[in-house]
C-alpha cells in the first residue's frame, strides 16, 4: 500500500489560515488535480469544510470525522485507520489535509508531493517539519517563476523514502 501526502506549503510551512488556503495559484490546482485524479483521497473534517463539503470529482473521497457524515459521494471514517481500510488497496492513497492528519500520517507516508510557494505568510495551520527526517529523497523538482496568473515563485517537488 502506498500512502502519499500532497500539500502546498509556504517557506514557513503554512498550509492554511482561518480554514482557507492563503494564496491562489492556478498551476498548483492543476498539479493537485493531476496527482489525485482517479485515486483515493483522505481528508480531515476541516479540509472537507474548506472545500465547501463537495466531493472532488473522479476521486474516492474519504472524510475523517468523529461525527458521522452522510453525504453522497463521500465515505465517512471515524479514524485514520478506518479511512485507510476504506481505501482501495491497489491504488495510491493521497492524504490531502489538514494539518493534524498530515502530522499523524507523515511517519507512514512513502511519498510527498509538495508545492513550495516562495513566501513567508501568516497562518494557523502548518505542514509538519518533514525535513527533520533525513530519509526523504527528492525524485523530482521543477522551479516555476511567477506570472500573470500565478503571483508567486513556486516549485513542485516529489520526495520518496
UniProtKB/Swiss-Prot annotation:
Keywords: NADP, One-carbon metabolism, Oxidoreductase. It comes from the Bacteria. One of its GO terms (biological process) is one-carbon metabolic process. One of its GO terms (cellular component) is cytosol. Its EC number is 1.5.1.3. NADP(+) binds at residues 7-8, 15-20, 44-47, 64-66, 96-101. GO terms for molecular function: dihydrofolate reductase activity; NADP binding. Substrate binds at residues 6-8, 28, 59, 115. Residues 2-161 form the DHFR domain. Pathway: Cofactor biosynthesis; tetrahydrofolate biosynthesis; 5,6,7,8-tetrahydrofolate from 7,8-dihydrofolate: step 1/1. It catalyses: (6S)-5,6,7,8-tetrahydrofolate + NADP(+) = 7,8-dihydrofolate + NADPH + H(+). PANTHER family: DIHYDROFOLATE REDUCTASE (PTHR48069:SF3). Belongs to the dihydrofolate reductase family. Key enzyme in folate metabolism. Catalyzes an essential reaction for de novo glycine and purine synthesis, and for DNA precursor synthesis. This is Dihydrofolate reductase.
Amino acid at each position: 500500500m502506498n500512502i502519499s501526502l500532497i500539500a502546498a506549503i509556504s517557506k514557513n510551512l503554512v498550509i492554511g489560515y482561518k480554514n482557507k488556503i492563503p494564496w491562489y495559484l492556478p498551476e498548483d490546482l492543476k498539479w493537485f488535480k493531476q496527482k489525485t485524479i482517479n485515486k483515493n483521497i483522505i481528508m480531515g473534517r476541516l479540509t472537507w469544510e474548506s472545500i465547501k463539503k463537495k466531493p472532488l470529482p473522479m476521486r474516492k473521497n474519504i472524510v475523517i470525522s468523529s461525527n458521522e457524515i452522510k453525504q453522497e459521494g463521500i465515505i465517512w471514517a471515524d479514524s485514520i485507520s478506518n479511512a485507510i481500510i476504506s481505501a482501495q488497496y491497489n491504488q495510491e492513497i493521497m492524504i490531502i489535509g489538514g494539518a493534524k492528519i498530515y502530522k499523524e500520517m507523515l511517519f507512514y507516508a512513502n511519498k510527498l508531493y509538495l508545492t513550495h510557494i516562495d513566501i513567508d505568510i501568516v497562518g494557523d495551520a502548518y505542514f509538519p517539519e518533514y525535513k527533520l527526517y533525513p530519509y526523504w529523497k527528492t525524485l523530482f523538482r521543477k522551479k516555476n517563476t511567477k506570472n500573470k496568473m500565478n503571483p508567486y515563485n513556486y516549485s513542485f517537488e516529489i520526495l520518496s523514502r
